[in-house]
Amino acid sequence: MNKTLVLAEKPSVGKDLARVLSCNKKGNGYIEGKKYIVTWALGHLVTLGDPEIYNEKYKAWRLEDLPMLPSPLKLVVIKRSGKQFNIVKKQMNRKDVEEIVIATDAGREGELVARWIIEKSRVKKPIKRLWISSVTDKAIKEGFKNLKPGRGYENLYASALARAQADWYVGINATRALTCKYNAQLSCGRVQTPTLSIISKREEEIKKFKPKTFYGIEAISNGLKLIWQDNRTNNNRIFNKDKCDKILRSIKGKNAQVIEVKKTYKKKYSNGLYDLTELQRDANRIFGYSPKETLSIMQRLYESHKLLTYPRTDSRYITTDIIDTLRERVKACGVGEYSKAAFKILKKPIKTNKSFVDNKKVSDHHAIIPTEQGVILSSLNDRERRIYDLVVKRFLAVLYPPFEYEQKIIKAKIKDETFTAKGKIVISQGWKEVYNGNFEEDGSNEDISDQILPNVNKGDELKISSISQTKGETKPPEPFDEGSLLSAMENPRKYMKSENRKLLKTIEETGGLGTVATRADIIEKLYDKFLIEKKGKNIFTTSKGRQLLDLVPEDLKSPTLTAQWEQKLSSISKGLLKKNSFINDMKDYSKEIVDEIKNSQEKFKHDNITGNRCPQCDKFMLEVNSKKGKMLVCQDRECGYRKSISKITNARCPNCHKKMELCGEGEGKIFVCRCGYKEKLSSFNKRKKKETNKASKKDVSKYIKEQKKSKDEPFNNALAQALSKLNLKKNN
């Protein structure tokens, strides 16, 4: 009997597909049934080969060998996943396999993962495509009933291939040119370099910012606060103190007369459903999670727990075909603290509107929402619970009625000067009930105060009990944190010099720099290359990063290049542009980049050289700040030796409660805090042991749980081991 080979992107998804398709016979790297054989990749199993596979001379990095423009680019099997590739290849080439179903992630990159494996395996069999947004049993069954012909995704594959090949030509040539020219480990790319430039420009804005003092006038009448307003501009700031003093003198001792009382009924709908970037922003703002951390948690909630839909989405809308499933989804997540809100939604027919249902605003995947699978909240760890909470509350909130209130504005005159007071009376909490008054989570950013305004009428006189001058200062832009950097990457129009409206529109339509799936990795790459560093929660460029921006060609620093690429890649995916035409342009562009770097008169200087010599090549080493602490790195790029000298731990300073760094080696290890506090590791362990003896069962259990969850080694191994052996008896 002929069979169908199903190729998933990851083992966890493959096992789910196998179970639903009744495949029970477990093989090495695959699961087989009567009709289907399910196997899987491990992400990419195949990639574009390094330059040396075209010519041995490319093993050495030399400026004179550039540009490298081999054609066609060859595929190679990734070494660490070669075993799984051979398993997949063998299954694909079985004589009883008549067709292949691509069941990798439904998107450009998922298409590339599968097509490269098929191409490298030299398989010529009919292809079908599974295109689903969640991996619940129901979604998988529906998806297999509606498999699409593989030829319908040929242009998507061409677009993915064009992107990968263009990144190879431009990225490898530019990186080698910079590295060879300046003998430093320098790298650039069409996404990471503009992102670095955006951070640098924000720093320049802050540096050049000159604060201005402004003044205002505040009048109080029987507890009512009235704010001065310019008659012409409606602004309440005065930048000229003499003008403010003059107004103040002219109205001192005078009462106010009400000239207008305006009441307006207002309603406000909940913020839209989450896409990945918005979720990463909120998780960073509320919990301090990095974008990569949030994506990793989301991936578990999608793949392992099957509670949320596909995470790598750039849409905040659902399609009309999802509407019929909403009741089931509300029932599935409506447990525990969500039961009250869910019950209220389910009492009546569910109402939808254009604020979250729009077919035109969904391309590959709809917004992140709960699946129809019931949740056991206790099965989630603390971090999973927090991310799940954000998604569920946002989902329930959009299904709730709007927040309704009456906005009231009192306008009064004191002599010839206008004063206003604003307030609101809540009519119905609506969707805000879901958040129980937690305004940090609901993200509503209310601009109308809750000041209770008195009942006054036009013509009434208000007795002014006090009138005073207020003073403030304009503030510079905030430095980027990971959340605000994601926003800038998503919408980088502000940083584009081009006046070309088409390009501005393209960068907006294509989601800015990078994709929802790659932005977290781009930020991590900038940390890993020591081009940016973290101070507190804020991100800053390093000296190396700033110098790199002085060295790279201007084109590579602007989001405009990405906009142009995405415009063409979009045309390829729609069948309007040939892939080879785009690649030829990229080869020409690579030549230009290399020539510009070769002819540059700029110099690169290591300004972080230490007195420590490299144990491998004896050259002086550089001190760099990585995301996890300080490192010593050999300045010679060909040597590549690196050593950690301190790392940021979870240990909190007893004085200021901030995370401390662990420095030194062996018995000389010492905790150091920015506030100046220092403590030897040995005395820290003793102190913690004493605290543990006094701790409650709950505290100790929590400590052990946190240690087990930590990705890095626990900062206090001896203590963690001792705690894990404790027999914690229940309190009577």
Residue ranges of model-derived segments:
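Metal- or metallocofactor-binding catalytic centers and their adjacent structured scaffolds
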Residues: 238-272, 280, 560
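Conserved short loop/turn motifs at secondary-structure junctions
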Residues: 1-3, 103-106, 183-185, 263-272, ...
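Structured, non-catalytic alpha/beta "coupling" segments that mediate domain-domain communication
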Residues: 28-58, 193-239, 399-451
